[in-house]
């Protein structure tokens, strides 16, 4: 048996688009995520110039032909479009959601922005569909949902290794007065907690 950090679900996607993003592509990925279940959540974060009305038209057209339209119709109650004034604004909005999947369907993204973004998995560029991540392309498909990407990460090989830490402390292993400062500070914390034997263990 192994422990888990969370029970992940329902499925989520946030899709960031601009005036050059393919409406058809955005619709297909939006519907692909929505079909996971009636509790799926999808967010379209659109920058100025994106053809939102066309997006709605294409979505309705594709939905009418979908074999899972009943499930998707229920899921669409949990979905919305959000207006963003700039890419930085869009990223800030996405960071409030911290979605399971984040697609940035924009070419020539400044990769220096990546450390600012919080999401379970991020798919960058106009041809990087989250569906590929669902099956073959990676990253791991065991991904935090419901904003849990704030404090946890996708499953990886690291989760199957046991790690421990080591400490060697002596008067000679610290800079001048460093060892004494370590003792004194540790004793103060122990005494403030009322753990007197902890403090006594550190008295020279």
Q: Could you describe each region identified by the protein language model?
A:
Residues 6-12, 38-45, 49, 53, ...:
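Gly/Ser/Thr-rich active-site loops/lids in small-molecule metabolic enzymes
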Residues 25, 29-32, 54-58, 92-93, ...:
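Alpha-helical scaffold segments in soluble metabolic enzymes
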Residues 1-42:
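Conserved NAD(P)+-binding/catalytic subdomain of aldehyde/semialdehyde dehydrogenases
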Residues 111-204:
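C-terminal segments
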Residues 18, 43, 78, 148, ...:
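Conserved short-loop catalytic and cofactor-binding motifs
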Residues 12-15, 40-44, 79-82, 100-103, ...:
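Structural motif
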Residues 7, 20-28, 45, 49, ...:
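Electropositive phosphate-/nucleotide-binding environments in soluble metabolic enzymes
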Residues 22, 32, 36, 44-119:
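A glycine- and small/hydrophobic-rich beta-loop-beta segment
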């Amino acid at each position: 048996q192994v422990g888990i950090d969370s029970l992940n679900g329902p499925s989520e996607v946030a899709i960031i688009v601009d005036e050059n993003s393919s409406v058809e592509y955005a619709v297909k990925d939006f519907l692909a995520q929505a079909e996971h279940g009636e509790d799926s959540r999808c967010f379209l974060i659109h920058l100025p110039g994106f053809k939102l009305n066309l997006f709605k038209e294409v979505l309705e057209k594709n939905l009418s032909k979908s074999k899972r339209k009943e499930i998707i119709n229920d899921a669409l109650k949990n979905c919305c479009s959000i207006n963003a004034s700039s890419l930085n604004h869009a990223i800030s909005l996405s960071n409030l959601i911290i979605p399971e999947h984040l697609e940035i369907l924009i070419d020539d993204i400044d990769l220096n922005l990546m450390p600012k973004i919080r999401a379970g998995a991020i798919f960058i560029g106009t041809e990087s569909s989250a569906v590929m991540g669902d099956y073959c392309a990676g990253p791991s498909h065991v991904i935090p949902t419901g904003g849990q990407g704030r404090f946890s990460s996708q499953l990886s090989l690291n989760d199957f290794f046991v790690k421990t830490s080591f400490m060697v402390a002596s008067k000679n292993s610290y800079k001048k007065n460093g060892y004494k400062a370590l003792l004194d500070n540790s004793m103060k914390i122990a005494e403030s907690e009322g753990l007197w034997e902890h403090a006594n263990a550190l008295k020279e």
